[in-house]
Amino acid sequence: PRMPEQWTVPLGEGAEILAERYGIARAVQDAFALRSHQRAAAAWRAERFAGEIVPVPGAEIDRDESVRGDTSLDALARLRPVFREQGTVTAGNSSPMNDGAAAVLLAGERAASGLGVEPLARIAARAVSAVDPHLYGIGPVEAAAVALRRAGIGWGDLGVVELNEAFAAQALACLARWPELDRAIVNPNGGAIALGHPIGASGARILTTLVHELRRRGARWGMATMCIGVGQGIAVVVEAT
């Protein structure tokens, strides 16, 4: 059956709802966005993305164009709200809908061994949750809890967490529900606010970044998680090999 035309709110309005519900001020959202850009710019300078990037031939593109390492809180503060006249969600503290592509190869242990492929990581657990579509941004909260429980580990066991940054307000709402999570390990190389959110590719992208960062740090456990605009969340726990 067809879905009703007006059955939920636009994604940006959903971010405004979360900002209001969790008391996330505009300045806090802008600071989160600035951190995303600064971390992504630092990661590019340190060539931490080199192992996971495949350049596009032709007019060669080998770097995300939306990273603005030179932005500032003043620059972000000058941007007008997009979804409400007196709102807090702007183009600067939201993810850009970049073009992009990502691919991962999944195989069972026997198949990988037979092909002589050395796995980068093992999927330990995954979970999907459902929430009120108006509050889609907190979908990762329950999904993450279930995935951790299924993997038999806790927040303190994680070495890296990749939380997709659809909006700063959305990501901060999730973090507010995870007080036991060390924020220093969340998106250490920046997130979608800086790197972009190519719909259909972001899940594979954050999973790829997660696995490479786990191996770079010598950490064992990691999680990739994201909200889904129609009222869901998804989380995957991986173990680096």
Q: For each of these PLM feature ranges, what is it?
A:
Residues W155, A173, R177, D182-N187, ...:
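Internal helix-turn-beta structural module
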Residues I24, R48, V117, I153, ...:
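Helix N-cap/coil-helix junction residues
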Residues V28-G114, E180-I185:
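N-terminal extracellular/periplasmic Venus flytrap/periplasmic-binding protein-like
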Residues A19-R48, A103-R110, P198-A219, V236-V238:
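Active-site-proximal alpha-helical scaffold in enzymes
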Residues E13-E16, A124-A194:
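Active-site pocket-lining segment
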Residues L18-A25, Q86-P96, A127, D157-A166, ...:
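Cysteine-centered functional microenvironments
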Residues P1-I17, Y22:
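Flexible glycine-/small-residue-enriched beta->alpha junction loops
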Residues D74-I138, E142-R150, T208-T209, L214-W221, ...:
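Condensing-enzyme catalytic core mediating Claisen C-C bond formation in acyl metabolism
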